[in-house]
């Protein structure tokens, strides 16, 4: 484990035990970027997970937003012997790029399954800008993990973001077209089969995060694609 990771693990443990309520204590919170302020706690928890022996040398990682983070049965559903879930809630493609070096690179996975873009579009990002963010991320992945095979799961339609469906479709198409020219990346189309089946049925009380039926579809699509590259 990198020295920075070890320091972060110790800091996270300390922070969870000691809450600062003293008004005389000077905080560096204002020096932290909005991205770091929003996601730092979740990322530190992931670094603690990485520190555990049971999570070392995982061949496959899930990386991205709460679509992955909330997938509690991912390892069982996917039936992968070695799987590490590095999803963190509310994350954007931008924040994934920010934390990629800290929580994915040290694991050096054989395969990375990636889901992000949902929250970027929800915050008003255009399809073109999202495409550009993906290109920046893909470039960094290629530089830091050139031997990792990567899978981009298309942005899903949802009841909550139905007004953004056209942007989602355009963003998926743009990224898919780019991936066709990238030897390191593969595209997993989650969006089309959800639309074909009537995407509303893949959601229950929560209009943004999928139900069991949605994860059943996602796991099948991932297994089918990964099976093409099993060693």
Which positions does each model-derived feature cover?
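Active-site flanking residues adjacent to catalytic metal/cofactor-binding acidic residues
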Residues: 63-64, 153, 188
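Conserved SGNH/GDSL esterase-like catalytic core that processes O-acyl groups on lipids
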Residues: 30-136, 159-169
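Alpha/beta-hydrolase-fold catalytic nucleophile elbow
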Residues: 115, 153-154
């Amino acid at each position: 484990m990198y020295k920075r990771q070890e320091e972060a693990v110790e800091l996270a443990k300390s922070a969870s035990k000691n809450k600062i309520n003293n008004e005389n204590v000077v905080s560096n919170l204002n020096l932290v970027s909005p991205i770091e302020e929003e996601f730092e706690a979740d990322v530190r928890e992931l670094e603690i997970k990485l520190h555990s022996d049971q999570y070392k040398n995982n061949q496959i990682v899930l990386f991205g937003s709460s679509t992955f983070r909330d997938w509690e049965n991912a390892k069982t559903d996917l039936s992968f012997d070695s799987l590490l879930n590095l999803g963190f809630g509310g994350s954007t493609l931008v924040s994934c790029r920010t934390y990629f070096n800290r929580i994915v690179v040290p694991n050096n996975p054989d395969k990375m399954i990636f889901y992000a873009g949902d929250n970027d579009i929800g915050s008003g990002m255009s399809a073109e800008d999202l495409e550009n963010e993906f290109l920046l991320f893909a470039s960094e992945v290629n530089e830091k993990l050139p031997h990792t095979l990567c899978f981009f799961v298309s942005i899903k339609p949802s009841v909550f973001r139905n007004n953004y469906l056209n942007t989602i479709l355009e963003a998926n198409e743009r990224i898919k077209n780019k991936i066709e020219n990238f030897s390191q990346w593969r595209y997993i189309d989650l969006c089309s089969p959800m639309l074909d089946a009537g995407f509303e049925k893949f959601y229950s009380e929560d209009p943004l995060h999928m139900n069991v039926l949605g994860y059943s579809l996602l796991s099948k699509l991932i297994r089918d694609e990964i099976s093409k590259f099993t060693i």
